[in-house]
């Protein structure tokens, strides 16, 4: 018997039991490292309540938060990717597709829905970054064109949320063709005078940034989103110079006039609805469901800065 056991009366010792906390209840902010309650983070649309860092959001979660709850219809869900080239690098392309579909629970890297935004008819496309880095390939291009065609048929606006590493190398030239294909489709929107708003989220790179992501009548970015063609590391290695702080981030781009505005995610739904109301002569929506943190910088304070 140890000396401590001799001192303490065993009847006063209460055995402790290890707490059993289910997995996935807590998560950590990628920016500030703060441990966060996942349910609270989801209520805040993936925005850290401590530092306002905008974490990556799945395509369906983004669409569900953006559109009205009623009357949403998914478009192009029957389109599935095929390994036409029988491509293989370190792994077969068809095996990569199966793995990506299991990981993301999506058939490909874009989800398209039509519905309403504050009662206004609208078509919305959103990239799924969890599917092979949101890379643009044949199905992504086909679904985006389907979104454009639906907007033309309904005579309504189109909004696209981009989150992509660029063109998918496993589809080679066919993936590069989607840059021209999507750009040509958007030209029809412009001919009809229908608004197209592009929302650039972290990251929007490569062939996506060089085509549909930067062709909006208004180009909006989320705070601190990485936006560009080649990545900063590649550029530094090429030009052999140190890049300025914040290079290719949305705050840097708005200073250079490359984008039109920066909008926080909780305010995105109301802001886009207000802009579309002005562009389409619809009545402006009420802002009852806008969530604005008192300790976060507002859009007006960003402008003043």
Curated annotation (Swiss-Prot):
Coiled-coil ranges per UniProt: none
Q: From what superkingdom does this record's organism come?
A: Bacteria
Question: What are the recorded GO MF terms, alphabetically?
Answer: acetyl-CoA carboxylase activity; ATP binding; carboxyl- or carbamoyltransferase activity; zinc ion binding
**Zinc finger, C4-type: residue spans?**
29-51
Any keyword Transferase? yes
Q: Which InterPro entries does the entry link to?
A: AcCoA_carboxyl_beta (IPR034733), Acetyl_CoA_COase_Trfase_b_su (IPR000438), ClpP/crotonase-like_dom_sf (IPR029045), COA_CT_N (IPR011762), Znf-ACC (IPR041010)
What's noted on cofactor binding?
Answer: Binds 1 zinc ion per subunit.
| GO terms of biological process kind | fatty acid biosynthetic process; malonyl-CoA biosynthetic process
According to the record, the residues making up region (Disordered) are 281-305
Q: What is its EC number?
A: 2.1.3.15
Instruction: Write down the Gene3D superfamilies for this protein, in alphabetical order.
Output: 2-enoyl-CoA Hydratase, Chain A, domain 1
**Amino-acid positions noted as binding Zn(2+) in the UniProt annotation, renumbered to this chain:** 29, 32, 48, 51
What keywords does the record list, in alphabetical order?
Answer: ATP-binding, Cytoplasm, Fatty acid biosynthesis, Fatty acid metabolism, Lipid biosynthesis, Lipid metabolism, Metal-binding, Nucleotide-binding, Transferase, Zinc, Zinc-finger
Q: Where in the cell is it found?
A: Cytoplasm
Name its co-factor(s). Answer: Zn(2+)
Do you know which Pfam families this protein is assigned to? Carboxyl_trans, Zn_ribbon_ACC
Q: Per the database record, which ranges form the CoA carboxyltransferase N-terminal domain?
A: 25-294
Protein purpose: Component of the acetyl coenzyme A carboxylase (ACC) complex. Biotin carboxylase (BC) catalyzes the carboxylation of biotin on its carrier protein (BCCP) and then the CO(2) group is transferred by the transcarboxylase to acetyl-CoA to form malonyl-CoA.
Identify its protein family. Answer: Belongs to the AccD/PCCB family.
Subunit text = Acetyl-CoA carboxylase is a heterohexamer composed of biotin carboxyl carrier protein (AccB), biotin carboxylase (AccC) and two subunits each of ACCase subunit alpha (AccA) and ACCase subunit beta (AccD).
Q: What is this protein called?
A: Acetyl-coenzyme A carboxylase carboxyl transferase subunit beta
Q: What organism is listed for this UniProt entry? A: Pectobacterium atrosepticum (strain SCRI 1043 / ATCC BAA-672) (Erwinia carotovora subsp. atroseptica)
Chain's gene name: accD
